Design a protein with these regions (language model features):
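Intrinsically disordered, low-complexity regions enriched in serine, threonine, proline
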Residues: 18-20, 37, 48, 60, ...
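Amphipathic alpha-helical coiled-coil segments
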Residues: 46-67, 85-93
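Short, charged, amphipathic alpha-helical segments
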Residues: 9, 35-50, 70-77
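Short, charge/polar-rich alpha-helical segments
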Residues: 1-19
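Amphipathic alpha-helical binding modules
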Residues: 70-96
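Intrinsic disorder/low-complexity segments in short proteins, especially the signal peptide
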Residues: 12, 16-17, 27, 46, ...
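Non-transmembrane amphipathic alpha-helical segments
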Residues: 11, 18-26, 32, 48, ...
Length: 96
């Protein structure tokens, strides 16, 4: 396995974990009344969103360096893009 493939696979796994955590945070945020917990959840959500954004930038670079149309880099770009869009769309939950 090439080094970039290994990196891409690791990033795919990380994005999957981050995406699940972001969903769990939103669910917790909606169901709790504790202001301190809501503050921590909001902060963690922001940090995770930043990390997914960083991974998206890396994925774009990997995609540029790989001439193939169908590959893991393209999959990584698509998954991170969907995670970012899902988080942007649902970010309104924090301002209810």
């Amino acid at each position: 396995m090439k080094e970039s493939q290994s990196l891409t696979n690791n990033l795919l796994m990380e994005v999957e974990v981050l995406s699940n955590r972001l969903r769990n945070i939103k669910q917790c945020y909606k169901s709790t009344e504790n202001k301190a917990l809501k503050g921590r959840l909001f902060s963690e959500n922001k940090n995770l969103f930043k990390r997914v954004s960083e991974i998206y930038k890396i994925a774009e670079l990997l995609k540029k360096n790989n001439p193939e149309n169908i590959n893991f880099s393209n999959l990584l770009v698509e998954i991170t893009k969907r995670t970012l869009n899902e988080n942007k769309f649902e970010s309104n939950l924090f301002f209810l």
